[in-house]
Design a protein with these regions (language model features):
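N-terminal catalytic cores of secreted or lumenal carbohydrate-active enzymes
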Residues: 1-93, 97, 106-107, 134-137
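Conserved short loop/turn motifs at secondary-structure junctions
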Residues: 48-54, 84-87, 113-124, 146, ...
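CE4/NodB-like, metal-dependent polysaccharide N-deacetylase domain
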Residues: 95-134, 192-210
């Protein structure tokens, strides 16, 4: 029997904001209720996320009981995730909360979900199978990211600890039977054609047949057209049947980040970097506040849910219209304000147990005893893990105008171009390239540019620290960039490099380059719950012409040529005789070339969501919509560090210093009327990185190459943190935060009237092209293959026209509801035609 899964893929914010798409949800559910009332055995997969229901009920709470009834009867299949986040860009706690909240929601609605439905996420992290197992998720349906030498619909996906999940690879995409009711005469031919195309990739004999599409509000029952030839299924039922019919299936280990069969869009790692920077800071504050709140049995779930909505793949990847991303900035600012207030309130409560004085609030589990400089002050940090620790000693000022520094870990001196020699390497080199890509994909070429110093001077110096101010100007044709940089030296092995970049111009890539002169060292990158080893270049991709069998199923965009840009969260390291790491906060795209240059991509300036004919990508990626905010013209802050150690990248010694960079101490002043109290409050310590609070305990994992504290390498577990607060004589304390996480401020240029005129000119060109195709169609027989090819072209041109028209309205400050709905309908019609043309191509041969 042929199993068909009916579903929708709900891009709640992409070419239209959720304020618009939420209105469409009501329409979807009205139709679903009607369909199920007529066909009680109908099943519908709600995109594997419970956020859709949250959105629906926020607008139409009267649906709640009906929805619960559908879930409990098995007609509506929800979860197990809360939202379809981007796993490459989301921080560790958010990834955990996304599963936790999803499973909780499913339970509250009376459902059950043990198979993840992730049909359009832009790749997956290595430890997801282990996380899924922790939450009772046994399988997954995937499309993007899969890297199999020989494609197979059924495979096992394994984490480093040995945990695995059963997977269904949707090699033909998630919409191969979509819109049968709109192609009634071809319905049975489409079914037969899809089965014929896909069965060669199936080990079980079953092929995934999916009736659904993006923002589909018209659910259909394919049995009306295909009768007894098919049976409606669910993700769980399909998975069980497929694996019951197979004895041996291929196993894939680790990350799924390949664009071999479907794009994972590496360019999205650096699109609208200002969003990534703000998301990082808000994510850190959530983690800190949740920990402090847990000591008093308080939860911050609603704040986390608001945050998770910004991590949905189209949102955090920056591939939506400007309206959406401007709203994200407002959400981040509001979240940060609420968290900052809560953070201070929790510190005030903790401060009642302390004496008056200065304290370092530490969120790193490691112990430190060295002079630490935060860019304003240099003090002796004596911490014993996570807690509050008294600060008694500050560095003494001295006179020294030399642009060099030496400690137990390195010798450093500045060069005339503003770059810095640190032992054997050169860092702080700024590189500018011409960017030819779009919001989805990066394509760069060399360009002529100049970089000169406008200021370089010592700002502060002591016995144990030095702060150097550096200002540079970068210029190229149509581009002007000014930087204000603060380079911080202290007793640690970290050289901290903070930058404020003021940019004007477009279509460029600005990178922070560290020259290691190591052409053969191994490359490692910090990713959620793991340190992964990667090749410098990924060439395991298919050519433009993948051959007849693959061409017939790979109808969507995929990467071709080679991939040089990869994701990271925290650091990129080269390991040879020593470990050299470049660390960054809220910046996620890197490249390591054949000579050993580590490039951290800071700003990638583009102005279209998706363009045609971007090098390195084949197929249709997304809408041709003008998004001037993606040029990143304005002011953006960055925080980086360079560290070289005689230690393995997967060692406690290395993570001790990375943790200091990623979770630096916050200096606070405590003032009480009496002087009773402690000089420290220690919550916990150790060498295992902690993630978040999970069911009242602390989730930790072992990133090291050897067992530690009873955990095998790569294994996750929880530890109980028992914090007992002593009685204090004074229940009031004033707290002043002297140095904390700073919210990245942004200021962008407004669109000009000339740019709007250029957009109108593009619209006129497309209108002329539409007229030409319509004339061609008049001379063709409607039953000919050429007619359908040209009809496909006409639908593509009309879609482009609507995309540009919606862009024009949005850039004039309007939200064109009617046009957005029309665009959604035209996108669906055009997508159906992909399969019609491919089907008829077989007959034309």
């Amino acid at each position: 029997m042929n199993l068909v899964i009916c579903h929708t893929h709900w891009d709640r914010e992409w070419f239209a904001p959720s304020s618009i798409t939420n209105e469409w949800l009501k329409e979807l559910f009205e139709r679903l209720l009607d369909l199920i009332s007529r066909k009680e055995d109908y099943r519908y997969v709600l995109d594997g996320q419970t956020l859709i229901l949250e959105d629906l009920l926020s607008l139409a709470p009267e649906f709640e009981e009906k929805v619960k009834g559908l879930v409990q009867s098995g007609n509506l299949l929800i979860g197990p995730l809360y939202a379809q986040i981007d796993f490459r860009l989301s921080p560790e706690p958010a990834i955990v909360k996304n599963i936790e909240f999803g499973k909780k929601d499913v339970k509250e609605y009376g459902g059950d979900a043990s198979v993840a439905w992730m049909v359009d996420n832009f790749g997956f992290i290595s430890q997801l199978p282990q996380l899924f197992k922790r939450y009772g998720i046994e399988g997954a349906f995937l499309w993007r990211g899969v890297k199999l030498e020989k494609p197979s619909i059924e495979f096992l996906w394994e984490s480093k600890d040995g945990s695995y999940v059963k997977c269904i690879f949707l090699i033909g995409g998630y919409r191969n039977l979509y819109g049968l009711s709109r192609t009634r005469d071809l319905a049975k031919k489409r079914l037969k054609h899809e089965i014929e195309k896909l069965k060669i990739f199936s080990l079980s004999g079953l092929v995934p047949l999916l009736d659904g599409y993006d923002l589909d509000v018209e659910p259909e029952d394919p049995r009306d057209l295909l009768n007894e030839e098919i049976e409606l299924s669910s993700a769980g039922k399909y998975l069980n049947e497929a694996f019951s019919k197979t004895e041996e299936v291929p196993k894939v280990n680790g990350e799924l980040l390949s664009g071999k069969y479907a794009c994972v869009f590496p360019g999205t790692l650096s699109t609208r970097v200002y969003l990534k920077r703000q998301a990082y800071v808000v994510g850190k504050m959530l983690r800190y506040v949740e920990l402090l709140a847990s000591f008093r049995n308080e939860r911050i779930d609603e704040l986390y849910r608001t945050y998770l909505k910004t991590l949905v793949h189209d949102n955090i990847c920056g591939v939506g219209v400007d309206t959406i991303h401007r709203n994200m900035r407002a959400v981040y600012k509001k979240l940060f304000g609420a968290l900052e207030k809560s953070f201070k309130e929790h510190l005030k409560k903790l401060a009642t147990h302390l004496k008056s004085g200065l304290y370092a609030v530490s969120f790193s589990p490691f112990e430190y005893d060295h002079y630490h400089c935060d860019g304003e002050r240099c003090y002796r940090l004596q911490s014993e893990g996570v807690g509050l620790f008294k600060v008694n000693e500050f560095d003494r000022a001295r006179s020294d105008e030399t642009l060099s520094f030496k400690n137990d870990y390195y010798e450093a001196f500045f060069n005339q171009d503003g770059s810095l020699n640190v032992n054997r390497i050169v860092t702080g080199v700024l590189q500018l390239e011409r960017e030819l890509g779009d919001c989805y994909s990066t394509d760069t070429e060399k360009m002529d540019f100049s970089c000169h110093i406008s200021k370089m001077q010592v700002e502060s110096v002591g016995q144990r620290h030095k702060i150097v101010l550096l200002e540079r100007v970068i210029e190229a044709e149509g581009i002007h960039i000014e930087t204000k940089e603060t380079i911080i030296f202290d007793e640690s092995p970290l050289v901290k490099w903070n930058m404020t970049v003021h940019s004007c111009g477009k279509d460029y890539l600005l990178s922070f380059v560290t020259k290691s002169f190591e052409g053969t060292s191994k490359v490692f990158a910090k990713m959620p719950f793991d340190v992964v080893e990667r090749d410098r270049i990924d060439t395991d991709l298919l050519p433009h012409d993948a051959g007849e069998k693959l061409n017939s199923v790979l109808l969507a965009a995929r990467e071709v040529g080679s991939i040089r840009k990869f994701p990271f969260q925290g650091f990129v390291a080269l390991q040879g005789e020593k470990t050299l790491a470049v660390m960054a906060k809220g910046v996620h795209q890197y490249e390591v070339d054949e000579e050993g240059d580590i490039k951290i991509d800071l700003i990638r300036s583009v102005e279209w969501i998706a363009k045609n004919n971007v090098k390195g990508r084949t197929g249709d990626a997304g809408p041709l919509m003008y998004v001037p905010d993606a040029r990143c013209e304005g002011v953006i802050d960055f925080e980086l560090a360079i560290c070289e150690l005689n230690a393995d990248v997967r060692s406690e010694e290395f993570f001790k210093w990375f943790s200091l960079f990623d979770d630096p101490p916050t200096l606070v002043s405590v003032n009480k009327q009496d002087d009773r109290g402690l000089e420290s409050l220690k919550f916990f310590s150790g060498s295992l990185p902690w993630v978040c609070v999970e069911n009242g305990e602390l989730l930790v994992y072992n990133p090291y190459s050897k067992p530690i504290h009873g955990l095998k390498p790569s294994q996750m577990s929880t530890i109980l943190v028992n914090v007992v607060f002593p009685n204090s004589g004074d229940d009031r304390a004033d707290v002043e935060i002297l140095g904390s996480l700073r919210f990245p401020q942004l200021a962008f240029k407004k669109i000009t009237e000339r740019e709007l005129e250029q957009l109108k000119e593009k619209i006129e060109i497309v209108e002329e092209e539409i007229e030409q195709v319509e004339q061609t169609l008049k001379g063709l027989r409607k039953d000919s293959y050429e007619y359908h090819v040209n009809m496909h072209k006409l639908l593509s041109e009309k879609r482009t026209l609507l995309e540009l028209t919606v862009s024009l309205a949005l850039n004039r400050g309007k939200v064109p509801k009617r046009l957005m709905r029309k665009l959604n309908e035209l996108r669906a019609k055009r997508r159906i035609y992909d399969y019609i043309v491919e089907l008829l191509k077989e007959g034309a041969r």
